[in-house]
Amino acid sequence: MTILILTDNVHAHALAVDLQARHGDMDVYQSPIGQLPGVPRCDVAERVAEIVERYDLVLSFHCKQRFPAALIDGVRCVNVHPGFNPYNRGWFPQVFSIIDGQKVGVTIHEIDDQLDHGPIIAQRECAIESWDSSGSVYARLMDIERELVLEHFDAIRDGSYTAKSPATEGNLNLKKDFEQLRRLDLNERGTFGHFLNRLRALTHDDFRNAWFVDASGRKVFVRVVLEPEKPAEA
């Protein structure tokens, strides 16, 4: 059995290389817009016929390129998504889950013609703590993702799983929805809890996500640091 893994994510690429070393007979590529150094590129839109003929399974590990219908119809395609489908499907699930309180986790699912939507093969929830930021939740999601893929890989490879459709359609967030969160309106009214959730949702390592414009017209970037109190020693 020959498998194609497509990934644009450094963490997922490490997992793909691990699977390749363990199981062999796999090719690992990034999409045309990927930025992984030294990883060959594959434009699935231009190579559908070749992929369908050559591979028995296509795995998307955070691949940013949408799969054409002809590819989905021609070969089994499975996606590994860092979200708990059907909640906050699409762009940066943990960001929106910190804000709206919906579940977050990792979902392995068959790919259909909609985004993060197909029948679910396996999934695992990740808790969000009051002191979490997008970055800290995402780090745990990557650990869960690795565990879940390794646990279910044999079934994914062989197709010996039972997939189930999501109970509801859920909701979908696109890149434009994330971009709308980034600019902070200093005159916006609301609770401090709401604003804190938004700031920690936009805090992700060194990324300059949240910003406001000060009185001089200068853009000012904002991150928050949350540190839980250590439990008292007995």
Curated annotation (Swiss-Prot):
Residues reported to bind (6R)-10-formyltetrahydrofolate: Q65, R66, F67, D112, D116, K175
Single Gene Ontology BP annotation: conversion of methionyl-tRNA to N-formyl-methionyl-tRNA
Pfam families listed in its UniProt record: Formyl_trans_N, N_formyltrans_C
One Gene Ontology cellular component annotation held by this UniProt entry: cytosol
Active site location: H81 (proton acceptor)
Keyword Transferase: yes
Phenotype upon gene inactivation: Mice infected with M.tuberculosis H37Rv mutants for Rv3404c present a highly significant increase in their survival time as compared with mice infected with the parental strain.
Annotated GO MF terms: hydroxymethyl-, formyl- and related transferase activity; methionyl-tRNA formyltransferase activity; protein homodimerization activity
Ligand binding (dTDP-4-amino-4,6-dideoxy-alpha-D-glucose): N9, H62, C63, K64, G90, W91, F92, P93, Q94, N209
UniProt-listed Enzyme Commission number(s): 2.1.2.-
Keywords: Carbohydrate metabolism, Transferase
Keyword Hydrolase: no
Domain of life of the native organism: Bacteria
Catalytic activity: dTDP-4-amino-4,6-dideoxy-alpha-D-glucose + (6R)-10-formyltetrahydrofolate = dTDP-4-formamido-4,6-dideoxy-alpha-D-glucose + (6S)-5,6,7,8-tetrahydrofolate + H(+)
Cited function: Sugar N-formyltransferase that catalyzes the conversion of dTDP-4-amino-4,6-dideoxyglucose into dTDP-4-formamido-4,6-dideoxyglucose using N(10)-formyltetrahydrofolate as the carbon source. Plays a role in virulence. Has no activity on dTDP-3-amino-3,6-dideoxyglucose, dTDP-3-amino-3,6-dideoxygalactose, UDP-4-amino-4-deoxyarabinose, and GDP-4-amino-4,6-dideoxymannose.
Additional detail: Was identified as a high-confidence drug target.
Similarity comment text for this entry: Belongs to the dTDP-Qui4N formyltransferase family.
Oligomeric form and interacting partners: Homodimer.
Protein name (database record): dTDP-4-amino-4,6-dideoxyglucose formyltransferase
Annotated organism of origin: Mycobacterium tuberculosis (strain ATCC 25618 / H37Rv)
Lineage, opening ranks: Bacteria, Bacillati, Actinomycetota, Actinomycetes, Mycobacteriales
